[in-house]
Amino acid sequence: MENQKIGFIGAGKMGSALMQGTIKAGIVTPENIGASDVYEPFLKDLQAKLGIRVSTDNAVIVRESDILILAVKPQTLSSVLSNLKNEITSEKLVISIAAGVPLSTYEDALLEGTRVVRVMPNIAATVSEAASGIAPGKNATPEDLKAALEIFSAVGTAVQVPESLMDAVTGLSGSGPAFIFPVIEAMADGAVLEGMDRKSALTLAAQTVLGAAKMALETGMHPGELKDMVTSPAGTTIQGIHSLEEAGIRAAFMNAVIRASERSKELGKK
């Protein structure tokens, strides 16, 4: 992939995170990355920081690229696709990260045979710890899927899923960081209530969540088994777990994922 040119249509937080991640991973060199955006000062900053090519004209970046990453808001996607329809040929791979927008939207709006891959990353891409679901379109090749997996693995973990589960991915990992931030805050609040200073409490709470996540990923053990490892009879941990269960923590998190997934489905129909 190192000789292929990647173009970003939209250079916001997610787009710029992907640029930095792919450069850092050595997947692509800065001179082979182009980015377009309506906000020219931001583009100039990216150019100075990363050494990439920039333009306020989307079509310029499309013409110069082999792989296009559409990193624009869902509400502006329709006009972007309409304006670029004749520029995006079947020789180019299109990767979109617009939430809730089905593959059929791109395949209907673009020229026949256009290769499209749909990706749902999350905000943790900004710290190279994203969780991304990837669904290839009907015209995408195995090489296209491999390229998408390589790009998004540069900023975290990426897995292939059928498009029918992309709304579930949105509800789980797309929205998920926002579900965890209040958990970190609440745990820290509990320690503050016990007399700890806020900075130390937040540091310990965030590290606790990070450590627990790493244990789940690296050991491959069921979360229930890991919980039991630190839960002694009549100990402190089981008292805390009892309080969480009384508050319905499991149902609350399950419902959060379900509601977010349902909202993603609703947005996809608009």
Swiss-Prot record:
GO terms for cellular component: cytoplasm. Keywords: Amino-acid biosynthesis, Cytoplasm, NADP, Oxidoreductase, Proline biosynthesis. Coiled coil: none annotated. Gene3D superfamilies: NAD(P)-binding Rossmann-like Domain, ProC C-terminal domain-like. Pathway: Amino-acid biosynthesis; L-proline biosynthesis; L-proline from L-glutamate 5-semialdehyde: step 1/1. Disruption phenotype: Mutants are auxotrophic for proline. Its main location: cytoplasm. It comes from the Archaea. GO terms for molecular function: pyrroline-5-carboxylate reductase activity. InterPro entries: 6-PGluconate_DH-like_C_sf, NAD(P)-bd_dom_sf, P5C_Rdtase_cat_N, P5CR-like_CS, P5CR_dimer, Pyrroline-COOH_reductase. Its EC number is 1.5.1.2. Catalyzes the reduction of 1-pyrroline-5-carboxylate (PCA) to L-proline. This is Pyrroline-5-carboxylate reductase. It comes from Methanosarcina acetivorans (strain ATCC 35395 / DSM 2834 / JCM 12185 / C2A). The gene is proC.
